[in-house]
Design a protein with these regions (language model features):
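Outer-membrane beta-barrel "beta-signal"
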Residues: 159-174
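Cleavable N-terminal export/targeting peptides
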Residues: 1-31, 174
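Short glycine/proline- and aromatic-enriched beta-strand/turn motifs that initiate or cap beta-hairpins
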Residues: 23-70, 170-172
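Transmembrane beta-strand segments that form the barrel wall of outer-membrane beta-barrel proteins
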Residues: 86-96, 117-128, 146-156
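Residues that define the transmembrane beta-barrel architecture of outer-membrane proteins
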Residues: 63-69, 102-106, 127-133, 146, ...
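Short loop/turn motifs that connect adjacent beta-strands in outer-membrane beta-barrel proteins
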Residues: 24-35, 78-86, 117, 142-148, ...
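Membrane-embedded beta-strands of outer-membrane beta-barrel proteins
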Residues: 71-73, 108-110, 135-137, 165-167
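Residue-level signature of outer-membrane beta-barrel architecture
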Residues: 75-77, 112, 139-141, 154-156, ...
Length: 174
């Protein structure tokens, strides 16, 4: 009887001492970060009020359709292999090169991408016509380690609205 009481007391003591360790949450592994930076090319349609503002305030004369060339710096953060992932990207563009002008644009977008490649993002945009909020959506097609994004963006501002379509490529690397 004494042995069973001692075993019971020892078991209760061990269980009591280990309870704090057992109640600790399981820490998930750190998120994988993948760089998906690469060149971008496309076009932007400018509202007439944007064209007028560029001419009046910046002495830049362009047609309402301008080319876009640039680079997208992108990081994708994996949270799970089966669910959506968080994405942050910085897009630097020069517009109007086809018309002999260089109109800079900088956007920083924060968004989400599904496992199938659909993506949505929002963030600030800065151009010579002012600061605005960019809304973007698109899809990324994958071929091995190469990604080919096709994105559509709308930037409404006090000066007017800009609508862009961009594509490019990136290679998946950690």
């Amino acid at each position: 009887m004494q042995i069973s009481q001692r075993l019971t007391a020892a078991a209760l003591l061990i269980l009591g001492l280990s309870t704090p360790a057992l109640s600790q949450p399981i820490v998930p592994p750190p998120a994988d970060v993948v760089s998906l930076s690469g060149p971008r090319v496309g076009f932007t349609v400018l509202s007439q009020s944007i064209v007028d503002t560029l001419k009046k305030d910046n002495q830049i004369t362009v047609a309402p359709l301008i080319s876009q060339f640039g680079w997208q710096f992108e990081k994708q953060f994996y949270s799970t292999q089966t669910g959506p992932t968080a994405v942050t990207e910085c897009v630097l563009l020069l517009g109007g090169l086809d018309q002999g002008v260089a109109i800079p644009s900088l956007s920083w977008l924060v968004g989400v991408r599904t496992r199938e490649g659909a993506e949505f993002g929002v963030g600030p945009n800065i151009t010579p016509t002012g600061v605005a909020l960019a809304l973007a959506a698109g899809i990324t097609f994958r071929a091995g380690t190469m990604n080919v994004p096709v994105n559509f963006a709308v930037v409404p501002s006090k000066s007017g609205t800009r609508v862009s379509v961009l594509t490019g490529f990136s290679l998946r690397r950690r």
